[in-house]
Amino acid sequence: MANQYEVLGKAPGPEELKKLSPNDVHLTIRGLSAGYGKMEILHNFDLTVSKAQSLCLIGPNGAGKSTILHSIYGFTNIFSGKIEIDGKDITNLTPAQKLSSVGIAYILQDNSVFPDMTVEENLLMGGFTKEKQDEAYEEAERIFEKYERLRNRRNQPAKVLSGGERRLLEISRALVMKPSVLLVDEPSIGLEPRYIDMVFEILRDLQQTEKKTI
């Protein structure tokens, strides 16, 4: 049986990875080894991502794609290496610190909508770390203005939303903190085909119009 290197080819080195993000580097990962408990999943991992770039990680189940996102956000144990935003070392910051002070938001692959809360209440949960709650309300209004699907259901329980609308709500909730980086884990998982294009169009708009790094 062919091994993974024969099937996928030689793993790219640091210089080859830099070619994917040649300008205005925003996120840098250097020599990262990380995992859960004492188990090391990532081994000496490198990555660079430019500002307003959309970069997709592709690989088989168990390859470590989610672990990379978890490590950036602070959900794993870091054994060695460094994670930087604009040259600032953020390796040991907590998830809350990365969200509030660095501008990194994580959108889980599992359904994280609170079904019995209204769409507006779900949206405002995204601003729970804001010191001034008025700012969360202002950002929520901007989001309602941008997305008619959510605006029309703002006072309805989230459980009435379609799968695509729930994913839109999850993405929008992350936007309340006005992040510069969106970590999106399996954005199309569990969605009907008719909603998949909608979700990717939303992400493309956030990258191109609002200059988010995704």
What are these regions (language model features)?
Residues 37, 55, 77, 117-138, ...:
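ABC-type ATPase nucleotide-binding domains, specifically the catalytic core motifs of the NBD
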Residues 58-60:
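The feature captures the beta-strand-to-loop junction immediately N-terminal to the Walker
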Residues 73:
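Helix-to-loop junction immediately C-terminal to a conserved catalytic motif
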Residues 81-89, 100-101, 135-140, 145:
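Conserved ABC transporter NBD signature motif
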Residues 157-161:
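Conserved ABC ATPase signature
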Residues 176-180:
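A short, proline-enriched helix->beta-strand linker immediately N-terminal to the Walker B motif
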Residues 182-186:
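Catalytic Walker B motif of ABC-type/P-loop ATPase nucleotide-binding domains
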